Regions:
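Active-site phosphate-binding/coordination module
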Residues: 16-126
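Short, structured coil segments at secondary-structure junctions
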Residues: 56-57, 65, 173-177, 236-237, ...
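Active-site glycine-centered loops adjacent to acidic/histidine catalytic or metal-binding residues
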Residues: 8, 42, 226
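Short hydrophobic/aromatic-enriched beta-strand-loop microsegments
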Residues: 58-66, 180-182, 242-244, 258-260
């Protein structure tokens, strides 16, 4: 019986700045050959998928952590943050040393305070590679300045702020208002990197929408992930598979815990589930 397979990218298919292991690439291709459908399910925007990931070959994907759902090159659904919530968030974000980017169908629009955030970050003991990645994140040429933002609906907000007190202040200000996820366990950087989203815009609801479109049930879905923005996906899918490098909270909700992503975890899990 055909299954719908959903794969997070960072920390699941590969670590940031790294390519997926050959075992994962071959296993996903074999699963598709065996009649299953494979989808990305990532916090990344459609325009920021690494080429090495795209080359694997997928039937579609969930992007911006549930903001967009696509089959092939066609976007089927878009789920936006409530405008009232967005306006409230912008008031908070503008009052803090937080660099942020609004993710929309027309691109990512960033605040213009990257230099301030970098100046406030503790750079002591930071490696050259970590500093390079920090600058690539804050000064990504793929983003557009906030002055060009025209009020387009927003899927979610990517944020970057100094670690420590400022990150704690951000969390306290937004607690109970939004879903706040960070990727500090994946990225050893002087800044905290994460996303702010409407609790109703998530990977789980996106999977439900895709299942309705395909005439499938969520029981036919198998989801692979490692981070807190994968929890709704695990609650929705018939089977949730946590990577060995996932946090304890993610592992606790999973039906299966496989090996780490760099230790052939995806290939081993697909074999264990009799999909390849």
């Amino acid at each position: 019986m055909m299954k719908l397979l959903f794969f997070d990218i960072d920390g699941t298919l590969a670590y940031p700045q790294q390519e997926p292991p050959v075992s994962a690439v071959e296993a996903i291709r074999q699963a598709r050959y065996n009649g299953h459908m494979a989808f990305l399910s990532t916090g990344r925007t459609i325009d920021s998928i690494p080429e090495a990931v795209s080359r694997i070959g997928f039937d579609g994907g969930i992007f911006s952590a549930g903001g967009q759902v696509a089959m092939g090159e066609k976007v089927l659904f878009r789920f936006h943050m409530a405008d009232s919530l967005l306006q409230e968030l912008l008031v908070w974000l503008r009052s803090m040393p937080v660099f942020y980017a609004l993710e929309t169908a027309d691109g990512r629009f960033h605040s213009e305070n990257a230099e301030e955030v970098l100046r406030l970050a503790d750079l002591s003991g930071i490696s050259e590679s970590a500093m390079k990645l920090t600058q690539e994140i804050l000064f990504d040429p793929g983003m557009r300045p906030m002055s060009e933002y025209g009020g387009q609906p927003v899927f979610k907000i990517a944020y970057h702020c100094p670690k420590g007190a400022e990150r704690a202040r951000l969390s306290a200000a937004l607690e109970g208002l939004v879903k706040l996820v960070d990727y500090d366990n994946l990225l050893e950087l002087p800044i905290s990197v994460g996303e702010i989203s409407d609790p109703e815009v998530n990977k789980g609801n996106a999977i439900r929408a895709l299942c309705r479109h395909l005439g499938m049930t969520t029981a036919d879905c198998i989801a692979f992930g490692d981070s807190m923005n994968d929890l709704e996906m695990f609650r929705t899918a018939g089977v949730g598979v946590a990577m060995g490098n996932a946090s304890d909270a993610v592992k606790a909700l999973a039906d299966l815990v496989c090996d780490r992503c760099e230790c052939d975890g995806i290939a081993k899990a697909l074999k264990q589930l009799d999909l390849i």
